[in-house]
Every structure is written in structure tokens, then in C-alpha cells.
Amino acid sequence: MSHSHRDALFQWMKTYVYRHSETPFRLASGLESQHYFNCKEITLHPERLSILAECFIEEIIPKLNIEFQAVGGLTLGADPIAYAISLGYQKRGKNVFPLVVRKESKGHGTGQQIEGFWKDIKTCLVVDDVITTGGSTLKAVKVLREVGINVTKGICILDREEGGSENLQTENVTMTSIFAKSEFF
């Protein structure tokens, strides 16, 4: 990845994303930690999201040795990442479809748990913003696999190094992150 891209992301992570508090934060996993990473400060900001997508497309994804037709994960953390990667590939002349996986099926309309053009998709690169225990990503993987989509690799902005990547590996999903928690303190 371009060091200027990673360096810019790292500075933004330190400035906007990482927080420390003596009073623990409750994480999505249910765990508590004095260290919190709100990656929405990257994924919901146009410039930062654009740089993030370029990092994934230019450096991280080529090293994965994977062909995929779609990119997505559990809403909300994965959504902007999937959209940005999809748009980045489209600008390069390749269609990679973004998929949104709901935590549960809709209670109205078609009742779908996956949104996007997924019915002809065979392979998906799963994405998330932060991996702690891997629970959210595993949920997305299981939903995608239930409809016949093959998922073997995933990417995230930050691995909290709390067993999530290992939990995903037990389900035959190899995660690759841009950053690790230990880089910040």
C-alpha cells in the first residue's frame, strides 16, 4: 500500500478513531475495554473512506490471491467499505457488487437478509471495520454461505487482537487487516 495512504490513515486513526478512557467502553462483542476504535470516523468521511478504499484495492486485496464477484459484510460497519471498494473497482473497469447483510431478515417486504445483486454471486470477500471476537463477521459469513456464496477471505481496518481472526480461521476465513490494536499503544 502506498505509504502515504497508510500513513494518512494511521494519523487519522490516532487523531479521530482511537480513544482511551479509564471508564471502559462496551464493545459490539459485549466485552469491555479502555481502548475504543470508532472506525466510522474513517468510513463515514468522504476523503478518509476514499483513501481507505485505495489502500484495500491497491495493496491489501492483491496479496490475498483471491477472485471475487462481491464484497460485503454485516451492516453497518461493512457497508461504506463495501460501497467504496465496489466503486473503486468500477472506476478500474471491473464490476464487484456490494452486498449488505442484515443482522436478521427484514420483517416486511421480501424479508431478505441480504441486499444487493447476490443471486448469481458465487464468491464474496467479507469486510468489516473492526474485528474483536469476529462475531459480526462470522454472522455475515454464515448468512452468505447459507445462500451458496463462497467466503474464504476477509479484510478489515483494525484487528483488536482479541481472538477474532483466529475464530474466523476456524471457519476457514482468513482475515487481513491494515492495522493492529498494538500499533496504537
Swiss-Prot record:
It is an enzyme of class 2 (transferase). Pathway: Pyrimidine metabolism; UMP biosynthesis via de novo pathway; UMP from orotate: step 1/2. Its cofactor is Mg(2+). GO terms for biological process: 'de novo' UMP biosynthetic process; pyrimidine nucleobase biosynthetic process. It catalyses: orotidine 5'-phosphate + diphosphate = orotate + 5-phospho-alpha-D-ribose 1-diphosphate. Gene3D superfamilies: 3.40.50.2020. One of its GO terms (molecular function) is magnesium ion binding. Its EC number is 2.4.2.10. 5-phospho-alpha-D-ribose 1-diphosphate binds at R102, K103, K106, H108, D128, D129, V130, I131, T132, T133, G134, G135, S136. The keyword Magnesium applies. Keywords: Glycosyltransferase, Magnesium, Pyrimidine biosynthesis, Transferase. It comes from the Bacteria. Transmembrane segments: none annotated. Pfam families: Pribosyltran (PF00156). The keyword Electron transport does not apply. Orotate binds at T132, R160. HAMAP family: PyrE. Catalyzes the transfer of a ribosyl phosphate group from 5-phosphoribose 1-diphosphate to orotate, leading to the formation of orotidine monophosphate (OMP). PANTHER family: OROTATE PHOSPHORIBOSYLTRANSFERASE, URIDINE 5'-MONOPHOSPHATE SYNTHASE. Homodimer. Belongs to the purine/pyrimidine phosphoribosyltransferase family. PyrE subfamily. This is Orotate phosphoribosyltransferase. The lineage of its organism: Bacteria, Pseudomonadati, Spirochaetota, Spirochaetia, Leptospirales. The gene is pyrE.
